[in-house]
Amino acid sequence: MKIHEYQAKELFANYGVPVPKGKPVFSVDEAVEAAKELGDFPVVVKAQIHAGGRGKGGGVKLAQNIDEVKTIAGEILGMQLVTHQTGPEGQKVQKLLVEQGLDIAKELYFSIIVDRATAKIVIMCSEAGGMDIEEVAASTPEKIIKVPVDPLLGVQGYHCRQAAYRLNLPPAAIKPFIKMVQGLYKMFMDTDCSLLEINPLVLTGDDGIIALDAKINFDDSALYRHKDIQEYRDLDEEEPLEVEASKFNLNYIKMDGNVGNMVNGAGLAMATMDIIKQAGAEPANFLDVGGGANAEQVENGFRIILSDKNVKGILINIFGGILRCDVLASGVVEAAKKVGLNVPVVVRMEGTNVEEGRRILAESGLNLTGAEDLKDAAAKVAQIVQ
């Protein structure tokens, strides 16, 4: 789960991490009042959406007086902000963060991530802050500093000092940096984060350390332990079909293609998307109905796929184990009758009760095409959508 910058900064402050003074606002009038409360200029008006690259897209601007705050807030609120993370359709801006301007001496990059390869938490930082860190890592990997932390041991002073020295921080900034890292690590572990990122982390003119930006992702599987974190969820920032799928415990991710697919098992779903692309088509979604799905879940999954107007054909790829083929077939038939099947469907089924499943589909009278194997299924659905 993602949250907004202003929400992440609230959490940072709770763990003693310095952040600029600021206030979230939802209208131009509120933005003006927030700027007046801050008192000093310049102030920064920042679009709040769940995506990076807001500055390059025109979603972060500096205001030198109240009139500029009013003008900038009016321009950003309601705009369709397009960044490299939103896709070409962009994301509508419905809220802003108005915060104090700072005397910035240096911009740094800081993050805490989970390294699954080593089963460790990694503190990652760089002197190349305020930039696209992916580009920095690709072009100048030597600028990326990585400090692995054993989660059983936790972050220690030497971890923090190692990062501070390699960042070439001035002596006066090292102690506040260590305190900040310890607070961020504790928050990362306490709240089950999967990613914590500050870009930029700034060194001020008086050698202070302040989190100028904030990005946090939480492990969805651990949210049941954090009712307070769940309250930060902003459904307006999420894909509506993904929100709908989550109500039925379906693992659904919308994509940009035109071949809808329904699969049981995440690995099989990814392999199915790969073979769809190899056949010359593009998947419209990832949908894992799970091994223990029932007819109702299958029906809901099918309905969600059909709700995507980009879908021109559907590939159903099921290996019947816990989810029997006859259960899947019944769910597909019920969903198609309720929603109205208006696109061709290719079905590849193997496993438990496969013959019964094929019989149910064959007698349904629906626009269905059978396939012998996955390669055959992908080729048929690719031909349909071309």
Curated annotation (Swiss-Prot):
The reply on keyword Acetylation is no
Q: Which UniProt keywords apply?
A: ATP-binding, Ligase, Magnesium, Metal-binding, Nucleotide-binding, Tricarboxylic acid cycle
The cofactor remark states: Binds 1 Mg(2+) ion per subunit.
Q: One of this protein's GO BP terms?
A: tricarboxylic acid cycle
Report the enzyme's class at the first EC level.
ligase
List the Pfam families: ATP-grasp_2, Ligase_CoA
Q: Which annotated residues bind ATP?
A: 46, 53-55, 99, 102, 107
Which coenzyme or cofactor does it need?
Mg(2+)
Pathway in which this enzyme or protein is active? Carbohydrate metabolism; tricarboxylic acid cycle; succinate from succinyl-CoA (ligase route): step 1/1
Recorded GO MF terms: ATP binding; magnesium ion binding; succinate-CoA ligase (ADP-forming) activity; succinate-CoA ligase (GDP-forming) activity
Kindly give the SUPFAM superfamilies that the UniProt entry links to this protein. Answer: Glutathione synthetase ATP-binding domain-like, Succinyl-CoA synthetase domains
Cleavable signal peptide: none
| Residues the record lists as binding substrate | 264, 321-323
State the EC number(s): 6.2.1.5
The reaction(s) catalysed by this protein are:
succinate + ATP + CoA = succinyl-CoA + ADP + phosphate; GTP + succinate + CoA = succinyl-CoA + GDP + phosphate
Residues that hold Mg(2+) according to the record: 199, 213
Gene Ontology CC annotations of this record: cytosol; succinate-CoA ligase complex
Domain ATP-grasp residues, every copy: 9-244
Q: Which family does it belong to?
A: Belongs to the succinate/malate CoA ligase beta subunit family.
Self-association or partners: how does it assemble?
Answer: Heterotetramer of two alpha and two beta subunits.
Function of this protein?
A: Succinyl-CoA synthetase functions in the citric acid cycle (TCA), coupling the hydrolysis of succinyl-CoA to the synthesis of either ATP or GTP and thus represents the only step of substrate-level phosphorylation in the TCA. The beta subunit provides nucleotide specificity of the enzyme and binds the substrate succinate, while the binding sites for coenzyme A and phosphate are found in the alpha subunit.
Q: Identify the HAMAP family for this entry.
A: Succ_CoA_beta
Protein name, entry field: Succinate--CoA ligase [ADP-forming] subunit beta
